[in-house]
Amino acid sequence: MQLLKQIRLATYFVIFILITSCSSTRFVPQNEYLLEEVQIKSDQKGFDAASLEPYIRQKANSKWFSLFKIPMGTYALSGRDTTKWVNRTLQKIGEKPVIFDTLQARLSQKDLKTALQNAGYMHAEVSFDVKTKGKSLTAIYTLHPGKPYYINSVAYDIQDQQIQRVLALDRPQNATLGLKAGSRFTVDRLDEERERITKLLLDSGFYKFHKDFIVFEADSTRQRTGVNLIVKLLKYRANSDAPITNHPRYTIRTIRYTSKDSTKINLRPSVLMYNTALIEGEPFSASKLQQTYLNFAKLQAIQYTNIRFRELPDTTLLDCDIQLSQQKPRTISFQPEGTNTAGDLGAAVLFTYENRNLFRGSEVLSLQLRGAFEAITGLEGYNDQDYQEYNAEAKILFPRFLAPFLSHSFRRQRSASSEISLSYNLQNRPEFHRRVFSSAFRYRWSEPHHHLSYRLDLIDLNYVHMPWISDTFKRDYLDSVSNRNAILRYNYENLLLMKIGFGVTYNDGQHAVIANIETVGNILGGVAKPLGFKKNEEGQYKLFNTAFAQFVKGDIAYTRLIAFDPNNSLALHFGLGIAYPYGNSKVLPFEKRYFSGGANSVRGWSVRELGPGSFRGTDGRIDFINQTGDMKLDMNAEFRTKLFWKLNGAAFIDAGNIWTLRDYKEQPGGQFKLDQFYKQIAVAYGLGLRLNFGYFILRFDMGMKAINPAYTSNEEHYALLHPNLKRDFAFHFAVGLPF
């Protein structure tokens, strides 16, 4: 029955596509055509014709998922009477049929030829043809590139000896850059060389140099597919009436700091100097100017920066004025919140104090106090039915490396911050009382030119103290023979975690790699025996009468974004994480264990509903504690498409699971085994909607189970072939994209 319903829905959808496709020709004027499709191809084998598609001026109507012209179909459902709101609405959210324009086609043909010539195909041609069917038309552009031109020789004609010396000094350092004999002759390559020389000279004091002073002469008369290239650097001329001279090389005489707000700049002189990449007595540098802007932009105490230069008459000296506008140094905020945990209602308040210039170095002090109260229902055998939580956190963010062992030049070249934090969390529940004390010291820095950012947790301490556990909770969950669970018990004991971690992120817009590694308890594990630490009944070493955790954890994730056109793209994602407890720990702390399912994982399952392995929870229900693991695998493919207005759509396939590295009796079927794990990979599919407001995205995903490793029967294991909405459906709401 369920399969018949799906077939029926698919049939209705196909009928809708056919009807709207036919009705769209109603909007095509007589003797004109609907642009049904645009094709671009080449008569030269192996030539990437699709890469030149952006040069085509008139495109056919957009398609959802690169298949269905739903926007045009929606528009076609409207009537011509725009006084009716239904017609106006359909036309607004839809897309008007594209009427073929001969002029646009001829201009596109010309643009394609120019693009081919710029790519080195100097004798390229582009032919154009059309195919008509009824009121529809297919436009076909055929590229005839011919043979590309190559550079036979490169010569530089530089009449300014000072510039000649600068370029000569740079040549050994950048031997792989610039124009070279044997390389393709393209406009892009010439532009790159023009930009390279201009940047080099602007960074070497030639304040008034610009790329128009560089011209190229190409001689191809003696070669059929080769050119002899001359790069000319013209001398300086201020204007058409001014004499021709050598290019002036400017030096910075003084740097002066002023306040936009007519108030004193409340930053230490050393901070101003540290963030100013420009240096008195050195040649002007455009790169150092940009770096100075970036340095001051990252300071929380500064609102914006304006840098101006003044020439001293009849000299090559510059005076630099750095004008700073300062932020309000202190802010206080009060934020009430409403909470809803599994139907239990509550309230919370958050008080925040922030000082953006604590030590006159743009250090940010943040103090947060949070209190929460929740009335818990459905608990039996407990005296108290309320949940209370209080949290206090103090954090100082320094906009630089706090590391005296690092060289001054290393610290200046990187955008970095150092963070020190302390926090205390108090939780009183009917079942137990928990206290958590945390402290951390970490660095963050980035290399924007290489698309890299780093995080180093030099030390991260967490002390968990359980001052009280109710007798009812002990009897029912911790001490009961039938419910004796090592994973559960471990998470209701006093525990000390001492972490060192490192993470790196690479993101160039198309490829993203995130890698993290952390080790916990290794320093303590190394000194426990030599220093004579005592052991508890479980054989674990104790510090201050508390056992410490010991494990290593590593994660890596890779995402690839493939754009087919401005409206359609494919996102591919792979994630792998492994955590191994050893030494002083046999079980990972609950907060460090992996879980699967949810909005950012395998979306056919709710959060913490999947795994580990073929484990399916107690009595088939979600088992909050046991459905966690030491290893996680995620594989995702998501096709993203533009729908209309701010609404985007997605179709996805997810696969993955979690596993344990040890065989825990509470998690039968959960251990990772090389000959079994691939049979336990869960698969889901679904559709999603995204509301893209630019600064944030609201995401709604609807997933269905396709392969469920928790079951062995064909009907439940291969849910794709036997779909059951009640059993297999999962809905997710989240902010931001999943990867």
Locations of regions flagged by a protein language model:
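Outer-membrane beta-barrel "beta-signal"
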Residues: 691-694, 725-739
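Extracellular loop and loop/strand-boundary signature of outer-membrane beta-barrel proteins
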Residues: 338, 377-382, 426-427, 485-491, ...
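Extracytoplasmic gating/loop element in the C-terminal half of outer-membrane beta-barrel translocons
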Residues: 318, 569-652, 660-664
